[in-house]
C-alpha cells in the first residue's frame, strides 16, 4: 500500500512539474519573461604575449623609432573543419581582426584595407559631389561638397596575410576507468573516469612589402590545446528504490584564444624585426604601461586632452563603467532613478 501511495505521489509531482514547464510565462514589470543570469564584467582579453606587444610599443616610443605603416589582409581558415551539426566552422573566422588588435598593441601605425566598403561608398558619393562635411539645414539649398584631394589616403609599407593551416584532433589522449562494487545485484556500486586529450592548431603568416610584393618575413607557429574530463558515480538500491548519482567536471582550453595567442606571438616577432629590437631583455629597461594610448586592449588616438582619466590602462579595468562595480556609475544610476 505504501509503495502504491509513493508511486501516486511521484506521478502527481511529475505531472505538476511538466505542466509548469509547459505553461506560458508571464512578463515581469520590466517587460521580460526571464532575467538573464551572469554578472561577470567585460574584461581585457590578453594572451601570454600581450605584455610583450605593449613593451614593443614602449621601446619604439622611447627610442623614437618611426614605424612603417601596416595593413592587414586576409588571414583565412584553411583547415576546412566544420561542426558535425553544420552550425559553423571549428575555428574562428576573425583571425584578421585579431591581427589588427595585435599590431595596434605593438604601436604599429595601421591603415585599413580589410573592410573599405564605407570609405569606397563615400568616395563614390564625393566624386559625384553628393557629400558635404557642412550640410545645409535647408533640404533644397546647395552646400559645400567634400573635395577629393590627390594623395589624401596614406599608403601601407607592408601588409600581413596568411591563414590557419592545421587543426589536429586528439594527437594524444590518456585516461582511466575504474568500477567497483558489491557482488550482490542490489549492492552499492561506484565508478570513476578521468580523461586527458591534446590537440593542436597551427598558423602561417607572411609580411609582404606593398610596393615590391617581396615577402620579407614568414612565420609558422603551432600551439597545443589541452582538455580534461573527470566524472564519478554511485549506483545503489535502498529499500526497493533505485539511486543513481553521477557528477563530473570538464575543461577545454579555449580554441579561439589559442588562435589569438598564435597571432600575437607572430606579431611580436614581426614587430620586433621592424623596430630593430634586440630581444625580450630590452623590456627590462622600460615601463610596459608607459604609453597612455597603448595597452592590452589595443590602441587609440585621443580625441581630447583627457589621458589622465581616460587611457589605455583605464580600459583594462574590469570595473570601469560597470553599474555593479563602478561606484560613480552606480551613484549616477541611483540619482537618476
Curated annotation (Swiss-Prot):
Residues 303-313 have a biased composition (Polar residues). The keyword Transcription regulation applies. It comes from the Bacteria. Keywords: Activator, Cell adhesion, DNA-binding, Transcription, Transcription regulation. Pfam families: CsgG (PF03783). Residues 314-337 have a biased composition (Basic and acidic residues). Residues 303-337 are annotated as: Disordered. GO terms for molecular function: DNA binding. One of its GO terms (cellular component) is outer membrane-bounded periplasmic space. Required for the attachment of the holdfast to the cell. May be involved in the positive regulation of hfaC. This is Putative transcription activator protein HfaB. The gene is hfaB.
Amino acid at each position: 500500500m505504501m509503495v502504491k501511495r509513493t508511486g501516486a505521489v511521484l506521478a502527481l509531482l511529475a505531472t505538476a512539474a511538466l505542466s509548469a514547464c509547459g505553461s506560458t510565462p508571464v512578463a515581469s514589470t520590466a517587460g521580460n519573461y526571464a532575467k538573464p543570469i551572469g554578472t561577470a564584467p567585460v574584461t581585457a582579453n590578453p594572451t601570454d604575449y600581450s605584455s610583450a606587444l605593449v613593451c614593443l610599443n614602449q621601446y619604439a616610443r622611447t627610442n623614437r623609432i618611426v614605424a612603417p605603416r601596416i595593413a592587414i589582409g586576409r588571414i583565412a581558415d584553411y583547415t576546412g573543419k566544420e561542426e558535425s551539426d553544420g552550425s559553423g566552422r571549428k575555428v574562428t573566422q576573425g583571425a584578421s581582426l585579431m591581427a589588427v588588435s595585435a599590431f595596434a598593441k605593438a604601436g604599429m601605425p595601421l591603415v585599413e584595407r580589410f573592410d573599405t566598403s564605407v570609405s569606397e561608398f563615400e568616395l563614390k558619393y564625393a566624386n559625384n559631389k553628393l557629400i558635404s562635411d557642412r550640410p545645409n539645414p535647408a533640404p533644397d539649398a546647395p552646400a559645400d561638397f567634400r573635395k577629393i584631394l590627390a594623395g589624401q589616403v596614406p599608403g601601407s609599407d607592408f601588409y600581413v596575410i596568411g591563414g590557419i593551416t592545421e587543426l589536429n584532433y586528439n594527437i594524444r589522449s590518456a585516461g582511466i576507468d575504474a568500477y567497483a562494487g558489491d557482488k550482490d545485484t542490489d549492492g552499492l556500486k561506484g565508478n570513476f573516469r578521468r580523461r586527458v586529450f591534446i590537440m593542436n592548431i597551427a598558423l602561417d603568416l607572411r609580411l609582404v612589402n606593398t610596393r615590391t610584393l617581396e615577402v620579407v618575413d614568414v612565420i609558422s607557429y603551432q600551439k597545443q590545446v589541452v582538455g580534461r574530463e573527470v566524472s564519478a558515480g554511485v549506483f545503489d538500491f535502498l529499500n526497493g528504490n533505485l539511486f543513481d548519482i553521477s557528477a563530473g567536471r570538464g575543461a577545454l582550453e579555449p580554441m579561439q584564444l589559442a588562435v589569438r595567442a598564435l597571432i600575437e606571438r607572430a606579431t611580436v616577432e614581426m614587430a620586433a624585426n621592424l623596430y630593430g629590437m634586440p630581444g625580450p631583455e630590452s623590456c627590462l629597461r622600460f615601463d610596459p604601461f608607459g604609453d597612455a594610448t597603448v595597452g592590452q586592449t589595443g590602441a587609440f588616438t585621443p580625441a581630447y586632452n583627457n589621458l589622465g582619466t581616460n587611457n589605455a590602462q583605464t580600459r583594462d579595468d574590469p570595473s570601469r563603467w560597470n553599474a555593479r562595480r563602478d561606484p560613480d556609475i552606480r551613484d549616477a544610476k541611483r540619482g537618476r532613478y
